[in-house]
Design a protein with these regions (language model features):
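Soluble ligand-binding/transfer domains with enclosed cavities or grooves
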Residues: 1-5, 9-177
Length: 177
């Protein structure tokens, strides 16, 4: 949604990091994928992450270079999003609650020297709610499933849940690569 446009500081259990969203060619607001992935990656992995690059031939694919010649290839294979604007529960006239939901399924392949690639499926479900002060509260659930070659088990190998707070105005010198 349009209220996502701009630079933000995210506070979560993983730390604090900048993210950016800008209007795309069709006018819809999209995340700056490589920048945002590098920011989150550095918060989670620290110096293990060297860089994140978008694949110029496939907008749904990213490559993350890690130490020890590891390469993490992430490809979004399905996504869906929905925006809602509903009256606030307090019933006050003109009072609205804007929410945005996103669901993304990615296939990740970890390439490691001298070993076969490790494949996993990651599903991330996110809910964001615009606050009256212009900040955004977020909640994310992530489930990691075995590789497709291991069968299509409905039970995740791992799951995680995070609370996020996006505050407007990332410092202009904040950068990631």
């Amino acid at each position: 949604p349009s209220w996502f446009a701009g630079s933000w500081i995210v506070s979560s259990d993983d730390g604090t990091y900048p993210v950016r969203f800008a209007p795309g060619a069709d006018g819809t607001v999209v995340g700056e994928r490589a920048f945002n992935a590098a920011s989150v990656g550095r918060a989670v992995l620290g110096d293990t992450l060297l860089r994140v690059d978008n694949d110029p031939a496939n907008p749904n694919r990213q490559l993350a270079a890690l130490i020890n010649d590891l390469l993490l290839e992430s490809t979004v294979v399905a996504r869906r999003s929905e925006s809602l604007v509903e009256p606030e529960a307090d019933g006050l006239a003109g009072s609205e609650q804007a929410e945005f939901f996103a669901d993304e399924l990615a296939l990740q392949v970890l390439h490691q020297p001298g070993a076969p690639p490790r494949i996993s499926r990651i599903e991330t479900l996110s809910r964001y709610r615009l606050q009256s002060d212009g900040s955004i509260d977020g909640e994310q659930w992530q489930a990691t499933y075995a590789s497709p070659g291991s069968g299509l088990a409905a039970v995740p190998l791992r799951s995680a849940h995070w609370q996020l707070k996006l505050t407007p105005g990332a410092p202009p010198d904040a950068h990631a690569s």
